[in-house]
Amino acid sequence: KMEAFNDRTKRIDFPYVLEYQQEAEIYRKMLRNADVPDMHIEPHAMEMAGLFGVLTRIEEPDNDRVGLLQKAKAYNGEIDDGDDIDVKQLREEGEEKADIAEGMDGVSARFIGDEIAEAIMDATHRGRGYLSPLSVFSHFEENLENHGSIPEENVDRYLRYLELVREEYKERAIENVRHALAYDVDEIQRQGEKYMDH
């Protein structure tokens, strides 16, 4: 049927993005080009969606000192000074473990972008003017099993990864609140001193 065309083409497999900040940027671009209502997207929503996508694409590390979440953060360039993580070694191990290459399997950016768009439409329908990471997680959870591109045998593992992302979001949200409260306390102190001086 298309022999002449097929003779002149060569398939090149290209892996998904493995840095979740870059993945989040893909979703932002998709939303800018999508026909969805403009609304406030709460902090961490895109990053946590990206983190979920990356977790489904990377191979679980062999050693006990680096977990899957730490590996995803290391790939993103987030290594604490005290951590002894060799990103190059992690990538080599991932390549050896993967069927073709690390990043060739997992949830697609299209699936995640579509679910974010659905979550926005759902929030609009419910009269909300914002999109929270929790509603994005709920959409992932509800639709993982029913999506044709996600093999049934991966669903339970992906749901486990989603729980890791929920916990990471919770920690980041708590840290944001701590930071905001600490800032407000200092600001209150300065304003109080300024008031007393004048």
Regions found by a protein language model. Give the residues of each.
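A short helix-turn-beta junction within AAA+ P-loop NTPase domains corresponding to the substrate/partner-engaging
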Residues: K1-Y16
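Detector for Asparagine
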Residues: N6, N33, N63, N76, ...
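Generic alpha-helix detector with strongest preference for long hydrophobic helices that associate
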Residues: R8, E93-A101, N154, Y158
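Conserved AAA+ ATPase small/helical "lid" subdomain
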Residues: D13-G113, I120
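Terminal-proximal interaction/regulatory segments of ATP-powered molecular machines
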Residues: E118-H198
